[in-house]
Amino acid sequence: MKAIILHGGAGTRLRPLTFSGPKQLIPVANKPVSQYVLEDLISAGISDIAIILGETYPDLVKEHYGDGSKFGCDITYIYQGKPLGIAHAVYLCKEFVGNEEFIVYLGDNLLQHGIKKYLEQFLNGNYDAFILLKEVEDPTRFGVAEFDEKGRLVRLVEKPKIPPSNYALVGVYFFKPVIFDMIKDLKPSGRGELEITDAIQMLLDRGYRVGYAIVEGWWLDTGKKDDILHANALILDERIKRSIKGEIVDSKVEGRVTIEEGAKVENSVIRGPAIIGRNCLIKNSFIGPYTSVDEGSQIIDSSVEYCVILREAMIRDVDRLEESLIGRYAKIVKKEGRRRALRLSVGDYSEVYL
């Protein structure tokens, strides 16, 4: 069994952060989104994994994951370049996959309970393809499933104006190698891409066995700022434990808070769930629930809540920062004048003076 992680796409909805790195490396709870994907695959027993690289900073992806040995897997890199569709990316992996069954996992998707249960359903059901579905409020943003009166899957429609159901395709697919024969016969869609939904539809039309499962628990497509903040809150709420390894001086740490080695908290209040990364400085500040502060960042004389702060950022003299996504090496500094609550999405190396 092999797996493919899709790590391409321009990430336009997460600009300005994606001007300086791929969207899948944006951290939630101080860990890149695509690392949760990698760990999910490994926990399901898969160790032979390909990462599809796009045009957006492929070297940063290689730098983070290396050959996979530090994560307990073997990683092969395959370059797609321009985003020509999921099916195109999958077809590039034909030689890598060989005759084995495989999983395709979008690198910006998160599943609360992981894929292990669904992998077992795919293997035990002897399906040619197996998809995951989740009921959503606005299915027009996704590929959508249509069923017959007996609940059998009959059609998949990509981002329909009039959805046949509210069941969206989750970004995880299970395939036998026969999918490559379908992709070979595809023509580009109206947006110039080879659509994986069209390839799966071809399987259905030609009588192959395509199964599905309704995902239990939450599923997140972390394509926008609010999605990142929501994912951060959910993961902090579920997975963060109280662990104090840094230095605490004249401060209160309330609830489930992780403070990593080398961090210093001075004359401050931290209320969990929250995580403070290595070598951070929190001084004369309040860190509220659902906040992640990545390594090397400094928060001084400020109040921060429900935020994701990337590494080496500085926030100083800000009365209230909330619902914000702050890039690496960014500076948010209050100079003079009236203080007020702020809501920001600030890219890497930015400087904001208030």
What are these regions (language model features)?
Residues 25, 145-147, 212:
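A structural signal for short hydrophobic beta-strand segments in well-ordered beta-sheet cores
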Residues 27, 173-174, 222:
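Short aromatic/basic micro-patch
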Residues 152, 178, 185-354:
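Left-handed beta-helix
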Residues 9, 108, 135, 224:
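Active-site glycine-centered loops adjacent to acidic/histidine catalytic or metal-binding residues
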Residues 9, 56, 177-178, 226:
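Alpha-helix/helix-capping structural signal
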Residues 50-54, 132-133, 325:
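Short internal beta-strands
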Residues 2-5, 13, 27, 31-106, ...:
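Conserved N-terminal catalytic core of the sugar/cofactor nucleotidyltransferase
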